[in-house]
């Protein structure tokens, strides 16, 4: 189980680096980032995304259009946050996880490695490694 895109991205990154490509971070000019946000290598921050204070984004992450990452979140490597998703404050996310379109995650939760959160879901509890969750997740 887990986010296939994370695996594919890892393979593409490995191939690109092996042949000498320089991989860069891309931040849309309409994105809003607090001054103290820490971004890993080759992050993509989409149009109108908002990343607030004391947030750490790992390597090779996609924070897509209109997503909101609130204060104190820690996002692992190869994580995709789809358009319109909201991660409220102090959430810890493992590696290779995927947050579907317009999902919401409650403050202070831990989301494991290789987790898939379905589109439109509301997550109200911690999610273990490898879980796929949909709907209202209690």
Regions found by a protein language model. Name each.
Residues 1-29:
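Phosphate-bearing ligand-interacting subdomains
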Residues 25-138:
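Structural signal for interior beta-strand "rungs" in well-ordered beta-sheet cores
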